[in-house]
From Swiss-Prot:
Tissue spec. comment: Expressed by the venom duct.
Recorded domain comment: The cysteine framework is XIII (C-C-C-CC-C-C-C).
The protein's name in its UniProt record: Conotoxin de13a
Predominant subcellular localization, coarse grouping: secreted
One GO CC annotation: extracellular region
Amino acid sequence: DCPTRCPTTCANGWECCKGYPCVNKACSGCTHGK
């Protein structure tokens, strides 16, 4: 999981962390958003 949540939300509702792009409708190194 990422140490912090970032405002970037992927198509699947995950929150992308700073420096981690959305990949294949998922996020790399991220936590689930609301």
